[in-house]
Design a protein with these regions (language model features):
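Extended beta-strand/beta-hairpin segments
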Residues: 1-52, 59-140
């Protein structure tokens, strides 16, 4: 399986702007720029997209683990907070902090913690990130 996205950029790093498009069409010339990345202007940025990918991948991985164990979650809600920090002359993603709140009937805390930890370690996005990954998982 191959998934594709395209970035188009015009101008300098600080003053230019670009757009992102995915083959699925979910992103269609979605704008991004220095200001959307570093100054909170409306638009997206690579780190936000990585956070969305990590949250979605982890949550689906956990849903599959729960299904295999015979559990059906009422709701799995995951937030990923990706940290971008200075690294020499450039920047690096140093961390992705996952916060999960899960409603899973009849699941005990030890089994939940084990499955959440396994999902964090084994989701494809976790595997591709060269960053510290933390998980705060609570069964509610």
């Amino acid at each position: 399986m191959i998934r594709k996205a395209k970035a188009v950029w015009r101008g300098t790093g600080r003053d230019g702007a670009g757009n992102l498009t995915t083959d699925s069409g979910v992103l269609d010339a979605t704008p991004y720029s220095f200001k959307t990345r570093f100054e909170n202007e409306k638009g997206t940025n690579p780190e936000e997209l990585i956070a969305a990918a990590h949250a979605g991948c982890f949550t689906m991985a956990l849903a599959f683990q729960l299904q295999a164990a015979g559990f059906t979650p009422t709701e799995l809600s995951t937030e990923a907070a990706v940290t971008l920090e200075k690294d020499g002359a450039g920047f690096r993603i140093s961390q992705s902090a996952l916060t999960l709140r899960a409603q899973v009937p009849n699941l005990d805390e030890p089994a939940f913690a084990r499955m959440a930890g396994d999902a964090e370690k084994n989701c494809p996005v976790s595997k591709v990130l060269n960053a510290k990954i933390t998980l705060d998982a609570k069964l509610i």
